[in-house]
Amino acid sequence: HLKGATALVTGANGFIGSHLVDQLLASGCTVHGLVRESSNLKWLDASKVHLHRVDLAQPDFIVPALEELDYVFHCAGLTKAKSRAGYFQVNATACSNLYEQCQKNGSRIKGIVHLSSLAATGPSPQGSLVDEITPCKPVTFYGQSKLAGEEIASQYSQSLPLSVIRPPVVYGPREENFFTFIKLIQKGWELQIGRAGKELSLIYVSDLVEAMLAASDPSKQKGRSYFVTDGHVYVWEQIAKECARIMNVQVKTLRVPE
């Protein structure tokens, strides 16, 4: 459904956004990318992507090329901010502006994918799983702002072909936070924050991109939220042990209170 289509990716220069751009181009799409004035574009080929400098933190930002778009992938988001208001401006309020413009001027749009986060749901009880109908109880400003963004997306899904994707920890080339964890192990340290045995889900970035492209398919049901994982449950100690085995290093555990 993507060959010959035109797609917009917000946060196109980011870890997930840049991988999505690569796959859209490989699928035969014309791609427009929203980036900030200060964005590092090292993972984007400016000769293949129509780049637009747009600051989603500004309340009056304008979405370019809306009349041409078949698909919109909203990947832009703020994972670190100085205040609660900073998170909410980009992760929630900006969604309202984006989808309002899509509603008014995006008459060709066949699919919108809103990239949220497992943080919008909040942590699961130890030993338990969460699913799409589990009540959301985010515990951080980031998670609360992502949930607010989801709620805005849900309102617009009444009139727009919109789906929400909630990834867990995403890993792969170009990622920095998970890579920092691995680099510490390479140096002989396993950083353990809080209690031992913390469970988590993972997804490889190319698998997440595949799920996002599938969710954009016009034949798929819209107005829904989806968790996407690799289907396994991990604990951090298990991941650290496997990383240490692959790199053939001995590690010491450094415990930090949560």
Question: Model-derived features: where do they sit?
Answer:
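Conserved Rossmann-fold NAD(P)-dependent oxidoreductase catalytic core, especially the SDR/UDP-sugar
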Residues: 96-141, 163
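N-terminal Rossmann NAD(P)H-binding glycine-rich loop of SDR-like oxidoreductase domains
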Residues: 7-27
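Active-site Tyr-X1-5-Lys
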Residues: 139-163
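Flexible, glycine-rich beta-alpha linker
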Residues: 122, 163-180
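NAD(P)H-binding glycine-rich loop region in Rossmannoid oxidoreductase-like domains
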Residues: 40-45, 50-93, 97, 121
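Substrate-positioning beta->alpha
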Residues: 148, 175-180, 194-216, 223-227
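Glycine-rich NAD(P)-binding loop of the Rossmann-fold in SDR/ketoreductase-type enzymes
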Residues: 86-97, 136, 140, 144-145, ...
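Mid/C-terminal beta-alpha module of Rossmann-like enzyme folds, strongest
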Residues: 218-258
